[in-house]
């Protein structure tokens, strides 16, 4: 079984709301999301699943439409920030919230996050995806950088939960054998959105 994890496209910024911030996609994010179906075109995808957060669901839309499949929402794929009242894109946090940015770039979750609970939720959701799949299936999951990293940390036995940079709409592929062995086949494939990434738009 192959699990293809796609990070959401670039969302809008939300400063402060009552309750949890749940941003949709920015204009460039819509364009990024529209690149994903072609990037996945050579895979025979049996199922499309997504985090319940808007930025992931809106990213999943073009791919699901192209495949003629429904998007199945899995609560366990939500990001660690799901209950926070603001969403500050990482490229903005680099300037405005340097201490938290440096913490994340050092490979650690934000200090307010319950890391064991987040890890358990994500890994349980991914285990359920694998259990439900036939061994020949390819499932695409639209999720978040933290979700992708938690899985990679578990597979590779890494010390830190946020080891890899995971770009907007990047593709990470994980293979599950029938014996339960998991292999990270590719990490952060981003050629399909390269010129649309913030660091390249502003270059």
Regions found by a protein language model. Name each.
Residues 2-72:
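Active-site-proximal alpha-helix that buttresses catalytic centers in soluble enzyme cores
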Residues 3, 137-143:
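Generic beta-sheet signal
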Residues 11, 147-148:
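Short active-site segment of divalent metal-dependent hydrolases/proteases
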Residues 34-41, 119, 123-131, 152:
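Generic structural signal for well-ordered alpha-helical scaffold segments
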Residues 50-51, 120, 142-143:
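Short beta-strand scaffold positions
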Residues 62, 150-154:
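Active-site signature of alpha/beta-hydrolase-fold catalytic machinery across serine-
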Residues 67-124:
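Phosphate-handling substructures
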Residues 69-73, 79-92, 131, 135-137, ...:
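Acidic, low-complexity terminal tails and accessory targeting/binding regions
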């Amino acid at each position: 079984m192959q699990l293809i994890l796609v990070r959401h496209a670039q969302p809008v910024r939300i400063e402060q709301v009552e309750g949890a911030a749940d941003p949709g996609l920015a204009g460039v994010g819509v364009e990024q999301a529209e690149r994903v179906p072609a990037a996945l075109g050579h895979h025979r995808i049996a199922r499309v699943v997504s985090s319940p957060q808007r930025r992931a669901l809106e990213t999943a839309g073009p791919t699901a439409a192209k495949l003629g499949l429904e998007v199945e929402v899995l609560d366990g794929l939500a990001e660690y920030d799901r209950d926070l009242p603001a969403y500050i894109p990482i490229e903005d946090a680099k300037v405005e919230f340097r201490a938290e940015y440096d913490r994340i770039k050092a490979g650690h979750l934000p200090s307010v996050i319950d890391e064991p609970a987040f890890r358990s939720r994500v890994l349980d959701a991914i285990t359920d995806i694998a259990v439900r799949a036939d061994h020949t299936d390819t499932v695409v999951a639209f999720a978040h950088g933290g979700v992708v990293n938690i899985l990679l940390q578990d597979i590779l036995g890494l010390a830190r939960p946020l080891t890899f940079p995971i770009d907007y709409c990047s593709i990470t592929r994980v293979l599950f054998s029938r014996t339960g062995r998991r292999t990270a086949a590719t990490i952060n494939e981003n050629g399909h959105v390269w010129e649309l990434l913030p660091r390249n738009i502003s270059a």
